[in-house]
């Protein structure tokens, strides 16, 4: 502070009052005002949620363990509720499932807005959560996304700020500790339910000629260009695959998924979007590459990313085991 006074005095003597005002006083006043507005702890940015008594149910498990299903069933039975997903496709599927069950559900993904004035439920991408609306039950899916450099803030915001007395968090095992720390920092109660995979996942010891794929195979690459290229190669060998990638229009993607589900297309080529909650009859996952561009750099896949995608093989109730 003494050093600041010396700087101010020197400016006053050399450049006059107007310079002191613009160079010293205004920036100091702005910093002081901002410090009063910014909470010392992120949880304190959500006073309405802090005033509630919330109970969290953590559904912890790998892919294909039924953890999301458990939370979703509770959501549909509640008078009001919200489902938060990492992908617009998952939010759309959640809305369709609830509407088919007679639950009046709106949709908000940023790209698609389908709002019913009389809705009791909302399906949305994590970023679109309203912090003003209260719900009886909230389900936040794929909570391991909290560690994502670009989108993790949305899961932090949802967990700290959602206005619901009962909150279900569905997450991979590696996210458990950070989720518990967040919940404990809020003073909320919690319980942990561990979901185990019922179908074994086996790692093959040899490479696969992808032009000799078998029914139920999913070929994974990490770009739209890669998906279209691999799909075209398969067509050249007389195999018509379904395709999935992030920018594919919903109606087109839905048709592709239905084609794979009903057997019209026996193979599927996809980006890592397939790892996020899309329940498809996949027998074997084939990685076409082990690197991806994450928005910043091209890097090797992380172990948890490999597990998330590979876990889609061996859908429960359809195949006795999965292969990768």
Please place each PLM-identified region on the residue numbering.
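Short, small-residue-biased leader/transition segments that mark boundaries at the very start
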Residues: 2-7
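Conserved segment of the helicase C-terminal RecA-like domain
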Residues: 174-175, 280, 284-324
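Conserved Walker A/P-loop ATP-binding site and its immediately adjacent core
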Residues: 72, 77-99, 175
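Conserved interdomain hinge at the start of the Helicase C-terminal
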Residues: 70, 75, 154, 196-233
């Amino acid at each position: 502070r003494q050093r600041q006074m010396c700087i101010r005095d020197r400016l006053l003597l050399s450049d006059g009052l107007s310079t002191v005002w613009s160079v010293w006083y205004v920036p100091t006043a702005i910093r002081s005002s901002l410090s009063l507005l910014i909470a010392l702890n992120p949880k304190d940015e959500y006073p309405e949620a802090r005033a509630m008594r919330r109970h969290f149910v953590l559904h912890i498990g790998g892919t294909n363990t039924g953890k999301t299903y458990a939370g979703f069933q509770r959501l549909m039975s509640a008078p009001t509720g919200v489902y938060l997903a990492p992908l617009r496709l998952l939010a759309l599927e959640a809305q369709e499932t609830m509407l088919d069950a007679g639950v009046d559900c709106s949709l908000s993904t940023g790209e698609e807005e389908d709002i019913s004035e009389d809705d009791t439920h909302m399906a949305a991408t994590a970023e679109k959560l309203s912090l003003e609306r209260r719900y009886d039950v909230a389900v936040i899916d794929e909570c391991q996304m909290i560690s994502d450099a670009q989108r993790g803030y949305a899961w932090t915001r949802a967990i700290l700020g959602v206005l619901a007395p009962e909150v279900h968090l569905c997450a991979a095992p590696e996210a458990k500790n950070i989720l518990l720390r967040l919940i404990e920092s809020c003073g909320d109660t919690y319980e942990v339910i561990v979901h185990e995979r019922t179908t074994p996942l086996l790692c093959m010891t040899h490479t696969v000629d992808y032009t000799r794929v078998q029914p139920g195979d999913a070929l994974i690459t990490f770009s739209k260009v890669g998906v279209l290229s691999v799909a075209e190669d398969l067509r050249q060998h007389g195999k018509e695959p379904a395709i999935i990638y992030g920018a594919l229009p919903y109606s087109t993607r839905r048709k592709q998924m239905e084609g794979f589900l009903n057997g019209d297309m026996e193979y599927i080529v996809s980006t890592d979007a397939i790892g996020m909650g899309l329940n498809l009859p996949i027998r074997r996952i084939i990685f076409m590459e082990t690197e991806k561009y994450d928005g910043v750099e091209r890097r090797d896949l992380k172990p948890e990313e490999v597990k998330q995608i590979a876990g889609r093989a061996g859908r429960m109730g359809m195949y006795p085991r999965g292969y990768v």
